[in-house]
Amino acid sequence: MTLASIRRGYHVIKTLLQYGLDDVLPPKMTPWYFKLARNSLFWIRNKHKNKPGGERLKLAMQELGPVYIKLGQMLSTRRDLLSDEWASELAMLQDKVPPFDGALARQAIEAELKAPIESLFDDFNETPLASASISQVHTATLKSNGKDVVLKVLRPNVETKIQADLQLMSQTAKLIEYLLGEGNRLRPAEVIEDYRVTILGELNLKLEALNAVKLRNNFLDSDALYVPYVYEEFCYPRLMVMERIYGISVSDIAALKAQGTNFKLLAERGVELFFTQVFRDNFFHADMHPGNIFISRDHPENPYYIGLDCGIMGTLSEVDKRYLAENFLAFFNRDYHRIAQLYIESGWVSEKTDLQAFEQAIKVVCEPMFNKPLDEISFGHVLLELFRTARHFDIVVQPQLVLLEKTLLYIEGLGRQLYPQLDLWQTAKPFLEQWMADQVGPKAMFKKVSTKLPYWADKLPEFPELIYDNLKLGRKLLSSQQQMLDKYLKYQQQAHKSNYLLITSAVLLICGTLLINRDATLWTPYVCLVSGIILWFVGWRSRPKNRKF
């Protein structure tokens, strides 16, 4: 551990204590030596006693900087781990930091391009268009075609700072896990590992560029989503160049109203976009907060979304997709028994779970929702409530499902902000039912067979040889098993014989000893003793030597 990491660790502890976060720790995590260290090494007064725990955690993370802000944003979606109060407070964290010097941005860009900016771009603006904790965006014009572009560049030394904070977080998580015990449902080390994978993915702008290209290709002919063109020849791990867009932020409702945007169509398209990305493409944008979503300025009566920042993308396994679709359908059919079964079948909840108790818990939580009109039922909150209920049954929430839940909450929130009367169920149900029909019907079976057909056709000439080899292997296995069985039976026979002789010798030795004590002149005790010694020797020598079969 370096001096810098020790200094950073002290700063983190000091900040957490200034906000009194040690007061909210469970007794297991505050043994006597913790309290001793708290009152001696860290004699720091809690300056925020009058504020609730969730708000104190939010303020502390805001002060600790970008890595902790992003961790807080991720934790805000983990309502299977945190209470509503804490999760809601963390959801308000904003990734806003002052920009770094434009001259440093120029140096970083030219280091990646290995050429002066002016040789490739005109009108490079050193004043950033936007600034975040990991990267910064500058505008320019592409010299080759005169088109407006944006250059996204990583902050100087951001990787080193993030790696140092991640190492500190990982060590702290392991300590917390040790104090709480292995069975604790919080699983801090697992949470930090999920976060590490997510944030390190954002540090590679080349990967983000590839994600953007893939998402763009998925929606090339779409009326719902436009992804700006990426100039891949200018993309590197620390630099990304893409088309500049001139949309309206999705959160600027006044500007959208002023241009006469069709809000109902826009909200419905947002829902369709989510389900298309998840169920058709299995590749969804997992960071769709208002800062990354814009609306087109042209054709407000037929508006489309513009998606930016593809640093965090999610995918689901085929199994997870099917279980998720069935979960939604079962919920709206009020089939709580099926929901409980799905959670167990998918492995999200242990197969040892009491099915009836789990079903009843789901019913208690979900049934009151049906007292509302369908257009007031929140898909995102359905997932939240189900995860929260499953938390008491030790649910294991997969990272990809957390990303999905986060995306669904964003999309649904945006949809209802644009058009409060949005009936998410009416928009989503046909899509889900059609997808399920495609997955389990005759067409799906034919599609799966046709997909595998080229592979089977390629392997068909090898079938006779494979069958012969398997039969040959089967004969060898049978022969080997027979040999093992023979060896085992022989071993058992030897063991029985040896045990019989040893037990008999023990009986003779005991009898001889007892008789000789009564009358040493008789020859019988000596016969017993000698016979016992001989039998013991024979029995010991006849023990089976090899236990390998």
Swiss-Prot record:
Pathway listed: Cofactor biosynthesis; ubiquinone biosynthesis [regulation]
Any one Gene Ontology molecular-function term assigned to this protein's record: protein kinase activity
Enzyme Commission code(s) on record: 2.7.-.-
Gene Ontology cellular component list: plasma membrane
Spans through the membrane: 496-516, 520-540
Domain Protein kinase: 123-501
Membrane topology term: Multi-pass membrane protein
Annotated ATP binding sites: 129-137, 152
Keywords in alphabetical order: ATP-binding, Cell inner membrane, Cell membrane, Kinase, Membrane, Nucleotide-binding, Transferase, Transmembrane, Transmembrane helix, Ubiquinone biosynthesis
Role noted for this protein: Is probably a protein kinase regulator of UbiI activity which is involved in aerobic coenzyme Q (ubiquinone) biosynthesis.
Protein's name in the database: Probable protein kinase UbiB
UniProt source species: Shewanella baltica (strain OS185)
Gene that produces this protein: ubiB
